Amino acid sequence: MVLVVGATGGVGQIVVGKLLEKGAKVRILTRNAEKAKKLFNDKVEVFVGDIRKPNTLPAAVDHVTHIICCTGTTAFPSARWEFDPEPNLFEWGKILLDSDYREATAKNTPAKVDAEGVSNLVATAPKNLSRFVFVSSVGILRKDQPPFNILNAFGVLDAKKKGEEAIINSGLPYTIIRPGRLIDGPYTSYDLNTLLKATTGGKLNVVIGKGDTLAGDASRIDVAAACVESIFYSASEGQVFELVNKGIRPPTIDWETLFLQLPT
């Protein structure tokens, strides 16, 4: 049983589709059961919960063998940060300038999702889990360099790094994928059958590497494929790698060879 967290998002939807194509049993953790049902019908088990609320997690992780975590929020303050109450013009100025005020008034910041939420999920995961796969971001180790210093203005790379550290330090088998700027989609208005017909618009090859040296775009379709394929190959276990699209794309992507080329 594979638990997909963030399953109704741009990458997560494709992850679910690719898992189902492979015949895997899929469970999803979602805050919005209605949206999940529209996307996946009855093809997956749906558990309502929230990684920001640890007490909602134990039932969802019970008897799962793998967790694929594709959660996230916007890098910059937006409605997706779930401010309560909704800020007026003056308050928006305070949000942009005062980090303490920002965290106090928003429920869905990068810190609350990618750092605290992921840490909650890791702490609740079964101790005999076969793999924890996490979608992070390029630039984690270059947050003081442009353009990543701009991307990290409100702490998204800091939060992703804390999420990575929680996973690495947990003792669980893991794979951490750091994609470039996400393209192709998100396909949030299509049903599952339409979603599975989506193809990478750029037709570029998949390039993976270590050490946070890569930059560029990454197809959501290829990122989702990397998440799914990684759980089937031991060479990807314990690996943290970047993924971007560059060069001429071959007829098929040989994921096993890509994973085997990663330094251990």
Task: List PLM regions with ranges.
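Hydrophobic residues within alpha-helices
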Residues: 11-15, 121, 163, 227
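A conserved pocket-lining segment of Rossmann-fold NAD(P)-dependent short-chain dehydrogenase/reductase
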Residues: 198-218
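Conserved beta-loop-beta element that borders a ligand/cofactor-binding pocket
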Residues: 131, 136-141, 146, 150-153, ...
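NAD(P)H-binding glycine-rich loop region in Rossmannoid oxidoreductase-like domains
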Residues: 8, 28-127
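N-terminal Rossmann NAD(P)H-binding glycine-rich loop of SDR-like oxidoreductase domains
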Residues: 1-24
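Non-catalytic, hydrophobic alpha-helical segments
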Residues: 11, 67, 177, 223-227, ...
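Alpha-helical substrate-binding/gating segment
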Residues: 219-264
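Substrate-positioning beta->alpha
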Residues: 117, 159, 212-229
